[in-house]
């Protein structure tokens, strides 16, 4: 999917080994938020983005889902900032590395992801 880049790949490996999987950055997320987002991913309305955050494949008017996505993205931002500080990179690089690892290891068939060019694709 994404081409390998040594620095990003190394950071992705660090993220995977240091924190579990980059898909679990929102350790403080509520189980209801996670359930809402997982259902939306299955329905094809929410997907993973190349920057490491969740995004809407289809715009939504559901305030509960919007809040759940925001909650998870906020937790991911904290994790990326913490990881960046520890490894001397920017939070953006940490997010991209996490997304790359997620795209390669955690996306299920049928899941949507937004590539680096901004195009939504289905695995």
Please report, for each region that a protein language model flagged, where it lies by residue.
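N-terminal secretory signal peptides that target proteins for export/translocation
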Residues: 1-4
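N-terminal export leaders
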Residues: 6-16
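Hydrophobic alpha-helical segments, especially transmembrane helices
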Residues: 9-10, 25, 77
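Sec/Tat signal peptide C-region and signal peptidase I cleavage site
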Residues: 22-28
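Amphipathic, charged alpha-helical segments and their helix-to-coil junctions
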Residues: 30-67, 87, 91-123
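Short, well-ordered alpha-helical segments
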Residues: 69-84
């Amino acid at each position: 999917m994404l081409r390998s880049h040594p620095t990003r790949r190394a950071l992705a490996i660090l993220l995977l080994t240091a924190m579990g999987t980059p898909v679990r950055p929102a350790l403080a997320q509520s189980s209801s938020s996670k359930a809402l987002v997982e259902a939306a991913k299955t329905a094809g309305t929410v997907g993973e983005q190349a920057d490491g955050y969740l995004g809407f494949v289809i715009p939504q008017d559901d305030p509960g889902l919007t809040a759940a996505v925001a909650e998870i993205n906020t937790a991911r931002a904290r994790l990326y900032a913490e990881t960046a500080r520890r490894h001397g990179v920017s939070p953006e690089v940490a997010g991209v590395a996490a997304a790359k690892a997620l795209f390669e290891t955690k996306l299920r068939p049928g899941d949507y992801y937004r590539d680096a060019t901004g195009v939504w694709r289905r695995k």
